[in-house]
């Protein structure tokens, strides 16, 4: 079965829109800081602000020059921290090489950290306090599995990739002792020598490594569940733009062996944006003392 992440994300966005319409206060507001004119970043930010508008969340796009210093960027973040009209702050990655993204994230108010990357929120997640802000992509995957009715308890989950954005927090969520967790988790990375062996053992594979069609049909068992987080451009002369977007899984050949699989595009990507909207609503509801 192909999991339609776009449909599930639309359901979540409709729920968020209805909750916002019930509120008598000001609309929630998300501030997005983007440094430089990286084309992909501009596309991602525009998608996020469009999604905000669709559900009734106000958004502010703060465009800053590529040459901005780390200290200047931190000052911009701190201005937003103390602005009572701002509920969520997101610093669009990647940042220029002269800026330490971790240090910038440390300066975001944890109560406005809707990306879920502040050390306080990461720490709360690690000790099982899941009522705060969870990183949007792992949160989206968790929600996708739950809404599809997939039980991960007792399953062997293999996470391929150990980034701070996807791999590490995903492992933390799946191993937690709560409904939707309790998996036996293995994390693979570039130095893992027996990847095929691990894949064949896994009941659930979540791959986020940025390598097109890394996972092939001979690497997975029948009935596996696969969540493909990869987004890769590959040359395709049959396409008008000369390329196609693929994931980290050889979808055409792997899908027939899967009990469930997410497509690329239309799988995890829409869920990431939906959970950003959810986190913004959560921050807003806390600041306004609302029980939404």
Swiss-Prot record:
Per its record, what are the GO molecular function terms?
A: methenyltetrahydrofolate cyclohydrolase activity; methylenetetrahydrofolate dehydrogenase (NADP+) activity
Q: Can you cite an annotated GO cellular component?
A: cytosol
Q: Which residues are listed for NADP(+) binding in this entry?
A: 161-163, 231
Q: Which reaction does it catalyse?
A: (6R)-5,10-methylene-5,6,7,8-tetrahydrofolate + NADP(+) = (6R)-5,10-methenyltetrahydrofolate + NADPH; (6R)-5,10-methenyltetrahydrofolate + H2O = (6R)-10-formyltetrahydrofolate + H(+)
Known pathway = One-carbon metabolism; tetrahydrofolate interconversion
Biological process GO annotation list?
A: L-histidine biosynthetic process; methionine biosynthetic process; purine nucleotide biosynthetic process; tetrahydrofolate interconversion
List, alphabetically, the NCBIfam families matched.
PRK14186.1 (NF010783)
Name of this protein: Bifunctional protein FolD
The free-text function statement in the UniProt record for this protein reads:
Catalyzes the oxidation of 5,10-methylenetetrahydrofolate to 5,10-methenyltetrahydrofolate and then the hydrolysis of 5,10-methenyltetrahydrofolate to 10-formyltetrahydrofolate.
Query: What would be the name of the gene that encodes this protein?
Result: folD
Keyword annotations of the record: Amino-acid biosynthesis, Histidine biosynthesis, Hydrolase, Methionine biosynthesis, Multifunctional enzyme, NADP, One-carbon metabolism, Oxidoreductase, Purine biosynthesis
Q: How does it assemble?
A: Homodimer.
Q: What is its EC number?
A: 1.5.1.5, 3.5.4.9
Which family does the UniProt entry place this protein in? Belongs to the tetrahydrofolate dehydrogenase/cyclohydrolase family.
């Amino acid at each position: 079965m192909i999991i339609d992440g776009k449909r599930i994300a639309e359901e979540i966005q409709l729920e968020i829109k209805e909750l916002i319409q019930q509120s008598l206060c000001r609309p929630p507001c998300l501030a997005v800081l983007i440094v430089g004119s990286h084309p992909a970043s501009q596309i991602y930010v525009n998608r996020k602000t469009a999604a905000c508008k669709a559900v009734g969340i106000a958004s502010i796009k703060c465009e800053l020059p590529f040459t901005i210093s780390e200290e200047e960027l931190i000052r911009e973040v701190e201005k937003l921290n103390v602005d009572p009209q701002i509920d969520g702050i997101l610093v669009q990655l990647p940042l220029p090489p002269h800026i330490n993204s971790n240090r910038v994230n440390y300066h975001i108010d944890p109560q406005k950290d809707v990306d879920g990357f502040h050390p306080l929120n990461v720490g709360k997640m690690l000790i099982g306090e899941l009522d705060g802000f969870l990183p949007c992509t792992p949160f989206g995957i968790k929600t996708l599995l739950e809404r599809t009715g997939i039980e991960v308890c007792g399953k062997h989950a293999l996470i391929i990739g150990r980034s701070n954005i996807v791999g590490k927090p995903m492992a933390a969520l799946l191993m937690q002792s709560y409904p939707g967790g309790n998996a036996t988790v293995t994390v693979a990375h570039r130095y893992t020598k027996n990847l095929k062996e691990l894949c064949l053992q896994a009941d659930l594979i979540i791959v986020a490594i940025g390598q097109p069609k890394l996972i092939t049909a001979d690497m997975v068992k029948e009935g596996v569940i696969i969540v493909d987080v990869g987004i890769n451009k590959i040359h395709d002369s049959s396409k008008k733009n000369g390329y196609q977007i693929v994931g980290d899984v050889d979808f055409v050949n792997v899908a027939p062996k899967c009990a469930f699989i997410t497509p690329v595009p239309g799988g995890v990507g829409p869920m990431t944006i939906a959970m950003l909207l959810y986190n913004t609503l959560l921050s807003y509801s806390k600041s306004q003392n609302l029980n939404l």
